[in-house]
Regions:
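Extended hydrophobic leader/signal-anchor segments used for secretion and membrane insertion
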Residues: 1-182
Length: 182
């Protein structure tokens, strides 16, 4: 059955509109994804060995910038934070919270005099640290690879809340090691 000229014209216009609708939908979805990643996440490539074995050099992670808007960091959280000088981004694990007294003695971390159990640590810390009290709005962060610590200078370990970028949420690369962190 042959279509009338008007029906053939309508069919052609319908196909053209369908292509535009699909293209507009894809563009809108791409814009929404870009907006979410700009506002919600920061991508970071690990360039040192400080968080091994949890995160290795060359891993790509997404730091959730909004997670800390609704809750404070907890002990054990992995955080991305801005360096004091040079503008670099570093990673560390929350060990000490505001008001706590933290010491490192004989390779072990003590919080308010009690030994901190850390399942993610494979090597003891090679340096001792006198007991220090973490100030209000501050967090004491340590690397997982404690054997790489050369210093326990508090200005390097105690991070203000303003310097925190976000909580490490997902390892996205390499693909074989994709993981979600809680």
């Amino acid at each position: 059955m042959e279509l009338s000229p008007r029906a053939a014209r309508n069919r052609g216009e319908y196909k053209r509109l369908s292509i535009y609708t699909i293209a507009a939908s894809i563009l809108a979805a791409a814009c929404i994804v870009a907006l979410i990643f700009t506002v919600w996440f920061t991508a970071v490539i690990i360039d040192d060995r400080g968080m091994e074995p949890t995160l290795e050099r060359g891993d790509a992670v997404l730091c959730d910038k909004l997670a800390l808007t609704f809750s404070s960091p907890k002990r054990g959280d992995m955080l991305c934070y801005r360096a004091v000088y040079g503008g670099g981004v570093y990673m560390g694990r929350v060990v000490g919270l505001a008001g706590e007294e933290v010491a490192i003695n004989g390779g072990s971390v003590y919080i308010n005099g009690c030994l901190l159990k850390e399942d993610y640590i494979t090597e003891a810390c090679p340096v001792d640290m006198e007991s220090i009290t973490v100030g209000e709005g501050m967090f004491l962060l340590l690397p997982d690879a404690r054997s790489s610590m050369q210093s326990t200078a508090s200005e390097e370990l105690i991070i203000s809340a303003e310097r925190i970028i976000g909580r490490v949420a997902v390892r996205v690369a390499p693909i074989s090691s994709v993981a979600v962190f809680e």
